[in-house]
A protein has these predicted regions:
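A glycine-rich dinucleotide-binding beta-alpha-beta segment and adjacent secondary-structure elements
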Residues: 223, 424-508, 512
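N-terminal Rossmann-like FAD-binding beta1-loop-alpha1 element of flavoenzymes
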Residues: 70-94
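Extreme N-terminal leader/targeting segments of oxidoreductases
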Residues: 2-4, 8-69
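Glycine-rich active-site loop/strand segments that organize a redox cofactor
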Residues: 113-145
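An anion/pyrophosphate-binding glycine-rich loop and adjacent beta-alpha core
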Residues: 289, 298-417
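Glycine-rich loop(s) and the adjacent beta-strand/alpha-helix scaffold that form part
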Residues: 240-243, 248-311, 515, 519-528
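Conserved N-terminal glycine-rich FAD pyrophosphate-binding loop of Rossmann-like flavoproteins
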Residues: 99-120
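Conserved redox-cofactor binding core of oxidoreductases
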Residues: 147-243, 264-265, 436-456
Length: 563
């Protein structure tokens, strides 16, 4: 596939060699400013643009010009569904992508099944999410998710089957409340690892291209275009050769470029909690945030949510085993939520890195705590020193380059395997055992029921690496994902999706109240922004139903848990 699309809607002889004048209102805030004297949008500075392709100086000469109804910036979890949904509604659409291929993360996506729930149950579940977010959630965006995510999950099931990469597992859970109401959620799991949503979105992009979407790879969006009224009328893309392409959008532009975790300048000011942590993703430099702020959009207030975890080094996360840092020293009360461990880890010698330590009795201990431990044989899947077939066909479900679990006969050997000082680890275990025998954790106050001696070989260690998976806040939007100015007024014909849009959660640590909500809300906002841009309405012409899902080849009894 070439960098530019095979199908263009506006072509003119000699256009590639002729300069095309841009609208004088392309970047109103920078009118009359020389390129060498750029005025930065409120809240931004020069360093914010150092890692991003976004340009502030007005671009007025183009190598080519194309016109579509809908232009999507970013071919990811939100962008590809947006573009495909737009063409399904009869619009012409293209998608600009900074990378040479679509890019996505995660594996599970979840939606709320309105027709299998009742109104009170849905409200109860949504209220539970808002309370879990300590009342910091954006209720409007939450409502959008609850209203539209169920249909989106069904749409993804049908389209992914057509694309040749359906979920390997689909399951529903029904919550029943004391008032007699109920709410059902459905989760699609794409994989198993090493396959993820990335394979899904790449397959979906091929389907979208077959159905009329033009993709422009290695062509980032670098500047939004507006008319004299302030409405967005297009975007400027930049090719690998450094040429500017003008993409006119007669109905709207959808920004779906992801978060800003790889823009260290923005991170240090807007999410300094994570500035010392490693990042899981690449290329997420806040391009959409910068582009929209350049035409007057706001950035949601500081206090941005972040998603930080490690589900790859080993299979256990919330078990309150002894935990040590890279110096081999205990540093916390281990009775903590996994998604919040970063709050302790940011103060450690190597932020994000730690090891869980336990012994041969761990299965009985976890069972006593009310959990379900991974048995020793299955734990071996995560041990890099044990050779076995970990291919996707094996069903191992791991990313082999990230597994980091170890089993040794002595603590000295375990320390070497984990890469931490043996004397420090031994001292930490000895001190821990003393506290267990005393019946009171005078160092960190962990409950006595979670204090268990570590004295029976073999000894186990899981070397964990907490990194930034996502920064879950972006440009200001309203409850319909329309981008807004700092004063709250809508910028016409401009939408944004996913984590780059608003702040759904609001909690410093992304809420795990509904597993799969992160990818689910990216897909949902993408699909429905594509529909809205194409039709002006937030409802598909032909909503996908379970009858469509069944017709696509799924066993509905399995999905509904009947068998």
């Amino acid at each position: 596939m070439s960098n530019l699309s095979r199908r263009n809607f506006v072509k003119g002889a000699g256009l590639a060699s002729a300069a095309v004048a841009a609208s004088a209102a392309a970047v109103p805030a920078l009118a009359d400013e020389a390129a060498t004297d750029v005025v930065y949008p409120e809240g931004l500075q020069a360093s914010d643009f150092a890692e991003s392709p976004v340009e502030l100086a007005p671009i007025t000469e183009f190598a080519a010009e194309y016109t579509y109804d809908v232009v999507v910036i970013g071919a990811g979890t939100g962008g590809v569904p947006a573009a495909l949904s737009a063409v399904e509604e009869g619009a012409t659409a293209c998608c600009l992508q900074k990378e040479s291929a679509p890019l996505s993360q995660g594996g599970t996506s979840t939606g709320i099944m309105l027709d299998e729930s009742d109104e009170q149950g849905v409200m109860n579940h949504m209220q539970g999410f808002i309370e879990d977010c300590h009342w910091r959630a954006d209720r409007g965006l939450a409502r959008f998710y609850y209203d539209h995510s169920g249909e989106t999950m069904r749409w993804m099931e049908v389209r992914s089957m057509e694309a040749g990469f359906p979920p390997y597992s689909i399951g529903e859970v029904t919550f029943e409340y004391e008032d007699g109401s109920k709410c059902t959620k459905r989760s699609n799991r794409f994989g198993p690892k090493p396959y993820t949503n990335n394979e899904l979105i790449n397959a979906l992009a091929k389907l979208a291209e077959e159905r009329g979407v033009d993709f422009y790879y290695s062509t980032p969006g670098v500047q939004l275009i507006q008319d004299e009224s302030g409405a967005v009328t297009g975007v400027v893309g930049k090719t690998e050769a450094g040429e500017y392409i003008k993409f006119n959008a007669t109905k709207g532009v959808i920004v779906s470029t992801g978060d800003y975790q790889n823009n260290q300048s923005l991170v240090e000011r807007y999410c300094p909690d994570v500035k010392e942590f490693d990042r899981k993703q690449v290329g997420k430099t806040g391009d959409g945030i910068l582009m929209t702020m350049a035409i007057g959009a706001g950035f949601v207030p500081v206090g941005h949510s972040h998603m930080m975890h490690d589900f790859d080094s080993g299979p256990m996360f919330n078990e309150p085993f002894l935990t040590v840092n890279e110096n081999g020293e205990r540093f916390m009360n281990e009775d903590a939520e996994f998604e919040q461990l970063n709050n302790e880890l940011r103060y450690q010698p190597k932020p994000g890195w730690y090891s869980q330590i336990f012994d041969a009795n761990y299965v009985d201990q976890v069972t006593e705590w009310g959990g379900r431990a991974t048995d020793p044989e299955k734990l071996e899947i995560y041990m890099p020193d044990i050779e076995m077939d970990r291919s996707v066909e094996s069903g191992a479900g791991v990313l082999e380059y990230l597994i980091d679990t170890h089993r040794c006969d002595t603590l000295e050997e375990l320390a070497e395997a984990l890469g931490i000082p043996a004397d420090a680890l031994i001292a930490s275990v000895e001190r821990y055992n003393e506290l267990v025998d005393a019946g009171f954790d005078s160092d960190f106050g962990k409950k006595a029921c979670y204090m268990k001696r570590i004295d029976t070989p073999p000894f186990y260690g899981i070397h964990k690496h907490i990194r930034v998976s996502a920064l879950c806040a972006g440009m200001t939007v309203n409850a319909n994902y329309q981008v807004t100015k700092i004063d709250g007024t809508v910028i016409p014909n401009l939408w944004a999706t996913g984590f780059g849009a608003g702040q759904l959660c609001g909690l410093p640590d992304w809420s795990m109240y509904t597993g799969g909500m992160s990818a689910g809300h990216c897909m949902t906002s993408g699909r429905y922004c594509g529909i809205a841009a194409a039709t002006g309405k937030y409802e598909p012409t032909t909503p996908i139903t379970d009858e469509d899902v069944a017709a696509a080849g799924y066993d509905m009894d399995v999905i509904h848990g009947v068998k």
